[in-house]
Amino acid sequence: MRHRKSGRHLSRTSSHRKAMFQNMAVSLIEHELIKTTLPKAKELRRVAEPLITLAKEDSVANRRLAFDRTRSKSAVGKLFNDLGKRYATRQGGYLRILKCGFRAGDNAPMAYVELVDRPVGGAVEAAE
């Protein structure tokens, strides 16, 4: 029975899932907008939102925890120097998931994941 087992397996091993969401979180932090499948987008929330909450209080311990979860110095720098300050007054809900149709090859539902209140520039390309 699968009672109270949360999270999607996404047809991957646990190490593959962990690496995939780590990479997706770093891409989201760096680009602030990514395009992925809808189930991956919904699971990404569980990884990315706690990182932003962690970045709201800048300390050496929190930076080490964030680096342990992302393994990217540039992502940790942006988290604590930019995003932590941007969302200091927001009590969660840092991500927005927008459905954007279906993928051409396998008809998988696709979605954009973006940071709320991100500065909107000219033509911003989604990292894929």
From Swiss-Prot:
Matching entries from SUPFAM superfamilies are given as:
Prokaryotic ribosomal protein L17 (SSF64263)
- Offer an example of a GO molecular function term for this protein: structural constituent of ribosome
**InterPro entries xrefs:** Ribosomal_bL17 (IPR000456), Ribosomal_bL17_CS (IPR047859), Ribosomal_bL17_sf (IPR036373)
Q: Which GO terms describe its cellular component?
A: cytosolic large ribosomal subunit
The source's superkingdom equals Bacteria
Keywords in UniProt for this one?
Answer: Ribonucleoprotein, Ribosomal protein
One of this protein's GO BP terms? translation
- Which family is annotated? Belongs to the bacterial ribosomal protein bL17 family.
Subunit description: Part of the 50S ribosomal subunit. Contacts protein L32.
Q: What is this protein called?
A: Large ribosomal subunit protein bL17
- Native organism is Pseudomonas putida (strain ATCC 47054 / DSM 6125 / CFBP 8728 / NCIMB 11950 / KT2440)
